[in-house]
Amino acid sequence: MSQLKLNPYFGEYGGMYVPQILVPALKQLESAFVEAQTDESFQAEFTDLLKNYAGRPTALTLTRNLSPNPMVKIYLKREDLLHGGAHKTNQVLGQALLAKRMGKKEIIAETGAGQHGVATALACALLGLKCKVYMGAKDVARQSPNVFRMRLMGAEVIPVTSGSATLKDACNEAMRDWSGSYEKAHYLLGTAAGPHPFPTIVREFQRIIGEETKKQILEREGRLPDAVIACVGGGSNAIGMFADFIDETNVELIGVEPAGKGIDTHMHGAPLKHGKTGIFFGMKAPLMQDSEGQIEESYSISAGLDFPSVGPQHAHLNAIGRARYESATDDEALEAFQLLARCEGIIPALESAHALAYALRLAKECTKETILVVNLSGRGDKDIFTVSDILNGKEE
């Protein structure tokens, strides 16, 4: 580990817990990333793609009718307006450019809700890279529009039937594939988790979210918000929002994990507040485990939050008290999903609806003028069938 250029740990969390065969690939990736950070032509191409292909900067929208409290302004950072429909596009373009820089011809990715898969497929189509996406068979079934989109853009979608047939199993299969193909392929990890240097790379390619938010809120309000709020699965949209505010100690950072059917039911995906530290997916991080240390299945109505661990920087921010992590249940997220649609004409992703649900809860408790910014990490087109079935009583 001595030859590493960046610190692989955030406090006690993170690291590079991978088979020896993958260490050279991760070191090569780290070197390429460090060089790209100071390469003006790389940064110019990345910025150009974000602006002229993905559509940045995204809007910061003040909600007109949503806030339950006249003293509270709720702003939405509109990552749902990004090409591809979610924040995922930011860092995927960055990593795909990095892969090309390293001379890789193929991209391997995993996806849960399908948003990262779609973002990877569009970046590969744009940049002329071959694309393979691993997706849990359950997620393939519940996210058929995104599966079609990926295939339409030329990606090969591989359903994973092992384990719980969800995101963690797709992660394992993608990592296994990469172990045998890293000389020609880049593993384009979809969240700010996994082995070093992925948590750092993903944060840096997502930090544009918080940078824009800071600039926009200062223009609109002349001050920083009281809190920024984002949903947390692996944690990439949240770390992208938080990164530029970490040193602004007057701004509260609030991550919202999925409480599923309720924290006390074990049917949830809240390892940060209710898990134990373990080794998973190449990193040391909080993990949902049973009493024997076996990984417990996570659960959330939203496929993108259905993950039994969390990125190491979030674990560290929680440990040092810089960020606070709450949770919202399926029912609260569904309520917020419908409320935003009815009040503002915006349909959020179910993932983002968790952050919104907590913001609404917080707004009701505020007793002074307060500005809240919610990262609306994605749009809800992919979730309309799931929500429709639930509201029509077709699912339990």
From Swiss-Prot:
Source species: Shewanella oneidensis (strain ATCC 700550 / JCM 31522 / CIP 106686 / LMG 19005 / NCIMB 14063 / MR-1)
Residues annotated with N6-(pyridoxal phosphate)lysine modification: 88
Family per similarity comment: Belongs to the TrpB family.
Alphabetical list of Gene3D superfamilies matching this protein: 3.40.50.1100
CDD domains named among the record's database cross-references: Trp-synth_B (cd06446)
Superkingdom, taxonomy of origin: Bacteria
Oligomeric form and interacting partners: Tetramer of two alpha and two beta chains.
Catalyzed reactions: (1S,2R)-1-C-(indol-3-yl)glycerol 3-phosphate + L-serine = D-glyceraldehyde 3-phosphate + L-tryptophan + H2O
InterPro entries: Trp_synth_b_CS (IPR006653), Trp_synth_beta (IPR006654), Trp_synth_beta/beta-like (IPR023026), TrpB-like_PALP (IPR001926), TrpB-like_PALP_sf (IPR036052)
Protein name: Tryptophan synthase beta chain
GO cellular component, one term: cytoplasm
Its EC number(s): 4.2.1.20
SUPFAM superfamilies reported in the protein's UniProt record: Tryptophan synthase beta subunit-like PLP-dependent enzymes (SSF53686)
This protein's UniProt keywords: Amino-acid biosynthesis, Aromatic amino acid biosynthesis, Lyase, Pyridoxal phosphate, Tryptophan biosynthesis
Entry's transmembrane regions: none
Function of the molecule: The beta subunit is responsible for the synthesis of L-tryptophan from indole and L-serine.
Signal sequence range: none
GO biological process, one term: L-tryptophan biosynthetic process
A molecular function GO annotation: tryptophan synthase activity
Pfam families (alphabetical): PALP
Associated pathway: Amino-acid biosynthesis; L-tryptophan biosynthesis; L-tryptophan from chorismate: step 5/5
Cofactor: pyridoxal 5'-phosphate
